[in-house]
Amino acid sequence: MERPDLYVLARFLDTLYESGEPMKKTNIQMRVGLNYPRFTEYFEWMAAHGFMQKGDEDGAEVYSLSPQGVEAYHRLVSWIRDTMKGMKI
């Protein structure tokens, strides 16, 4: 993916941050609201850029924000909320 949509990235970051705990891939997809092929593109992009970390919870793969992802959340999502007053992410 050459140019990701920053609003979609913000939805990923917001979903993982607001969850407060690691999430399964399916739950992330449902909360972000993308079809599977598009979700996979963004998911892989986020992982490749170090915004997520993978964990294990009772034998299931779960994902949460990495420290870099938390920083990106604070910068991008906060900027969107401040700039687009009241816009739902």
Where in this protein do the model-derived segments appear?
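Basic, amphipathic "hinge/linker" alpha-helix immediately C-terminal to the N-terminal HTH DNA-binding motif
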Residues: 59-76
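Short acidic, hydrophobic short linear motifs in intrinsically disordered regions
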Residues: 21-31
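Short alpha-helical segments that sit at the start of domains
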Residues: 1-13
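Amphipathic alpha-helical dimerization/coiled-coil segments
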Residues: 74-89
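A short, conserved structural fragment
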Residues: 47-57
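Short amphipathic alpha-helical interaction segments
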Residues: 2-3, 33-48
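Short strand-connecting beta-turns/loops that link adjacent beta-strands
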Residues: 21, 57-59
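Short, locally clustered residues in the helix-turn-helix/winged-helix DNA-binding domain
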Residues: 13-20, 77
